[in-house]
Amino acid sequence: MVPTVHANWRYFEMYDDSGNVINSWFGGGQDLTPYYLFEEDAMHFHQTCKTACDKHNPEFYTKYKKQCDTYFWNAHRYEARGIGGLFFHYCKETEDMKMENWFNFVSEVGNSFLEAYVPVVEKRKNVPYSAAQKTWQEIRRGRYVEFNLVHDKGTLFGLKTNGRIESILMSLPPHVQWVYDHHPEAGSEE
């Protein structure tokens, strides 16, 4: 019953031919994909993200949650990959946010990750589950794989630029299922 989580935080620099930095930016995020929704887990994860954001700008949580919900959308299925979180990219220096401010923000979000996720793991790791629930988990993991291989910009970039394939695919779950035209029973937990 432990949900899947995704997290990364990054910094990019571009250089000219002389080795001078000509552009730089931060990006990253963290999001949660439960197979069975426990409202208190969702609230805890999102509140932890919001608390981290609010320390830097009270508008960041709403903005970056919306970006997360938009980015992690499985368009071919018309469904979200999970319950969201934060997603931000191209965070460049402005009058209001110097690169040091962005570094502090990204560090705050990154440092909040364990606080957001570990309590959920601790609560759910020993919850018993049935064979039917395991099947549902693997079907949902299949949707996670679909997103990564069809929509995820980082995965697609790696695949199209001769990246290290094993490293790129290592983030995919080891056991998944696809059931043709599967629809959960109306009113079920799924």
Residue ranges, per PLM feature:
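Internal mixed beta-strand/loop scaffold within catalytic domains of large alpha/beta enzymes
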Residues: 1-25
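Aromatic/basic-lined ligand-recognition segments
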Residues: 8-9, 27, 69-94, 142-149
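Extended active-site and interfacial segments that coordinate phosphate-rich ligands
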Residues: 10-11, 25-31, 169-172
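A generic structural motif
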Residues: 15, 33-40, 90-105, 153-155
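Compact, glycine/acidic-enriched structural inserts
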Residues: 17-67, 183
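Generic recognition of stable, solvent-exposed alpha-helical segments in well-folded globular domains
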Residues: 44, 48, 59, 63, ...
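Extended, compositionally biased non-globular segments
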Residues: 99-156
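TerminUS-proximal long segments
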Residues: 155, 159-190
